[in-house]
Amino acid sequence: CLQWGVFLLPILPIFGSISIFLGMILSYRHQFKSIRKNPVNQGLAILSILLVIISILANNSLESFLGLFNFIPYFIMFAGLSEIIQTPSQLRQLSWLMIFGAIPVIILGLGQQYLSWSGIDILQGILGWSLQLNGNPVGRMSSVFMYANILAAYLIIIFTLTLGLLIEEWQNKAENNDGYILNKNQKITLLIITLLLTAIDLILTNSRNAWGLAVLSSLAYALYLGWWWLILLVTTGVTAVLGSAFAPSPIKDGLRMIIPAYFWQRITDENFVRPVETLRITQWKFALNLAQTRPLTGWGLRNFTPLYEAKMNVWLGHPHNLFLMMFAEIGIPTALFFMVIICWILSQGFLLLTNSLTNPSERLVYYSYLITFLGLILFNCFDVSLFDFRVNTLSWIILSGIWGVVDNTIGNSTKNSYN
């Protein structure tokens, strides 16, 4: 069920979510005792209670209770799925399924931008999406997602996992028994094509955030593998692009003859005149002010938007920073408690990578999940992706896999110590 759900989620989110839900239910049915005793799940249960209390005390309780659906169902899903995703081999299979599921998204995005594809509105109730002509905002690829930045967050997941699988297949002389009919060369070819098309789509989302994260994920693999030549190459390229945007005039002018204007114009934002109310720095200051005004309980989930609109006369769905949003909406103590849980999971993941995983192929697959989730964290420093059901679901599945492998390893070590 879970595998079908992961595959179908991007293009058929309703059917994908049902499959994932059924997989989660089966996990609870067979592993409820283990789920209940897991310390991370206990922490998430406490966090859920705190969020309910905060919603009762919120400035707008109705909005805050609606906001619970962006958190508590995913805590429940995490607890169930981390009991059934427990090996690097399973992570590899899920990576392949995410990549196969992304291919239609990538193709539809290219059609949207270059072939003026649009519509399918009549099937929106079944598909859960429609294709907007020339993207949203116009000129920025959004494919099957509501907005270009959400597509960018999704593509960062696909780009990072695809790059990890490509490196693994390239290095691995033996065939992986992953259950697919493709041979090694066919898999490498498919991964290269998918990676290139994903990179093109990332560029066409016009998301500076995603561009930077694609570079950082590439550097993360290069550092892990000790590929200093690639680090030098990427660093040189990034320096040239940034120089074309911000270097002093003689240097900048020369670099702009080499670097396409598409990049440095977007980085400098010089083609856009933005009202002060729409600037990220303005939103961040407002969110900080909200956090300082009600530091203990916050203003309630989804309360940033009406408060900002009342003050600035501009509607914004979020302050373009997940952490500042949480400080403002659920209070500093609860937000920090949430962050501690996530940091604990990731720290245990890196300890597992360092101390317990010995198979190079398994280490690389697990590492790809760690840096994918870290990439999502960095993405949410300049945007907020949790309001999109599909990206949020994939994010929690990735975290479930990270913790599931840790929990399984700890369990096996405990059993061995008693034998």
What are these model-predicted stretches?
Residues 1-66, 76, 86-92, 96-99, ...:
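Transmembrane signal-anchor hairpin modules in multi-pass inner-membrane enzymes, especially those
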Residues 2, 130-144, 278, 314-325:
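Juxtamembrane membrane-water interface segments that cap and precede transmembrane helices
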Residues 12-22, 63-69, 209-211, 228-234, ...:
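Short, aromatic-rich membrane-interface segments at the entry and exit
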Residues 20-23, 49-52, 76, 92-137, ...:
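Alpha-helical transmembrane segments of multi-pass inner-membrane proteins
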Residues 22-27, 215, 367-419:
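Transmembrane alpha-helices of multi-pass inner-membrane enzymes
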Residues 107, 113-116, 204-205, 222-271, ...:
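A membrane-periplasm/extracellular boundary helix in multi-pass inner-membrane enzymes
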Residues 270-330:
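Long extracytoplasmic/lumenal interhelical loops at the membrane interface
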Residues 330-377:
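Hydrophobic transmembrane alpha-helices and their immediate junctions
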